[in-house]
Amino acid sequence: MKKVAVILSGSGVYDGSEIHEAVLALYAIEKAGATWHCFAPNIDQLHVINHLTGDEMDETRNVLIESARIARGNIDDVAKLNVDEYDALLLPGGFGAAKNLTDFAISGAECSINTHVAQACRAFAQAGKPAGYLCIAPTIIPLIYGQGVQGTIGNDEATAAAFGHMGGAHVNCQVDEIHFDEKHNVLSTPAYMLAENISQAASGIEKLVDKLVKIA
């Protein structure tokens, strides 16, 4: 049975993983006949957002501990991710992907990526194993695959431009579409960059996961 490593970035769209995307992805992996295991960096979040009001809260939360909520405890430090034990990689979106895995939300095209997250993602790229990135997470793709790699975040002009400045070649997609860069074996879909509800987000995520598991 194929195994997919899933890297989470916290719990909650504004400061961590987009929960709908993460759960849809885990469900789709199982539905496609594969298994999953979650990972996250053992670091503090950039900040904590009150998801009721949108206000920043004066507290500190750990990305790994928060991500464990989504994974029901079935999670490890991303520093322990061994590419040899998995067939594919998947990164859901949410602002945590751009605040905790990288600092794209702060630095844009000049962003940097967490060391252990970079090591894990590059290990899959170097091994030629497929990877899928959802929502805002595709902004990580140029940091891993380099000049000319293709990906989509939907059709947001500013984010697409940043993707290009980082060395990527952005491809506009609708919410129910996926883009597959066959040369680099990497998939992406807009998810909640465009989705207005769960079912719309699911339309692209399920297609991406089906393809990911098929080519793994």
Task: Tell where the protein language model's regions lie, with residue ranges.
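Accessory recognition modules or surfaces
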Residues: 1-8, 12-18, 47-57
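N-terminal beta-loop-helix "entrance" segment that forms/cooperates
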Residues: 39-65
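Glycine/small-residue-rich loop that forms an oxyanion/phosphate-binding "nest" at active or ligand-binding sites
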Residues: 58-74, 79-82
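Active-site-adjacent pocket-lining segments in enzyme domains
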Residues: 5-37, 74-216
